[in-house]
């Protein structure tokens, strides 16, 4: 949960929360009709949130708004279905089945830290009408089984062990995701799911990486909601390619790693977008090159030749402007 929603109270900016304290009835009144929902809800962090008034209001009404008029009208119907339906229509509570914009506005009233509120309205998800509750559940996903925190560190000398991640039910609960990653993402991103099924892929399906390691689903100022711009996302893990180099390869720094690599999956080695590496080079290097006035054809630049036979430092070099070493 964001820092602003972890304290003893959360002040809301929504107009209805300017209602008089007497307009709020408390969770016990909600339970009289919505027993299962309240039992589920009270296991979550959301159930502990409050906002200030004459008395601190806590529970369902923190998100759904004051419930007195709604509750009184339903009770006055005395079990008559038609009267209840009319009461619900006349005195509705906020429903997260509303529009994506209304749902997001409700959540972002509290979730304002880490630039979430600033960027989400301009994110690709928001632009496509994706609301918070399509990925997150406002009530409980699963009860926490393991209170210990995950340990992502490796013991000294062990470089190929799988990281010990937090118990799945713990981080599902903490972020209230309806499904674990990557399943929650694959629900919409079917094409990317197919790419991750290709023989060479980043280890997202195996659980060694998450989509959110590279992307921020709540929005950033970068293409594809990347956490860092361009190649910086990649070198966050591939540190040996970071540089800086005296002789930078413009394809890396200007266009980025995706010029040559498909980060999600490929049928080619090293996630290359082309089967033969030389085909990648020829996308940019279209002219007739010579080295010391000797045509490349005499140096093995033929159908079966690979540029990296000689240009071994293709990501950048501190020694040679032609990336020969």
What are these regions (language model features)?
Residues 1-325:
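Short sequence/structural segments immediately N-terminal
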């Amino acid at each position: 949960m964001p820092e602003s929603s972890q304290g003893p109270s959360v002040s809301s900016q929504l107009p209805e929360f300017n209602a008089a304290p007497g307009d709020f009835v408390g969770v016990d009144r909600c339970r009289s009709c919505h027993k299962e929902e309240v039992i589920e809800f009270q296991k979550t962090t959301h159930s502990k949130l409050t906002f200030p008034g004459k008395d601190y209001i806590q529970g369902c009404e923190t998100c759904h708004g004051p419930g007195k008029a709604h509750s009184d009208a339903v009770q006055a119907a005395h079990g008559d279905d038609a009267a209840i339906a009319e009461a619900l229509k006349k005195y509705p509570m906020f429903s997260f089945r509303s529009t994506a914009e209304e749902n997001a506005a409700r959540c972002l009233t509290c979730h304002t830290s880490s630039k979430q509120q600033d960027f989400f309205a301009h994110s690709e998800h928001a632009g496509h009408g994706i609301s918070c509750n399509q990925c997150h559940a406002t009530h409980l996903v699963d009860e926490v089984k393991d209170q210990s925190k995950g340990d992502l560190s490796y013991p000294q000398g062990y470089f190929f062990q799988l990281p010990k991640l937090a118990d799945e039910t713990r981080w599902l609960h903490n972020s209230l995701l309806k499904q674990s990653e990557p399943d929650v993402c694959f629900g919409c991103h079917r094409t990317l799911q197919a790419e991750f099924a290709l023989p060479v892929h980043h280890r997202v399906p195996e659980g060694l990486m998450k989509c959110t390691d590279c992307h921020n689903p709540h929005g950033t100022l970068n293409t594809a909601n990347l956490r860092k711009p361009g190649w910086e996302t990649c070198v966050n893990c591939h540190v040996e390619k970071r540089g800086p180099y005296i002789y930078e390869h413009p394809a890396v720094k200007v266009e980025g790693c995706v010029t040559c690599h498909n980060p999600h999956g490929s049928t080619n080695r090293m996630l290359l977008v082309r089967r033969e590496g030389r085909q990648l080079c020829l996308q940019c290097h279209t002219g007739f090159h010579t080295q010391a006035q000797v045509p490349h054809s005499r140096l093995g630049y033929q159908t079966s030749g690979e540029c990296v036979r000689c240009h071994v430092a293709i990501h950048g070099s501190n020694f040679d402007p032609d990336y020969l070493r």
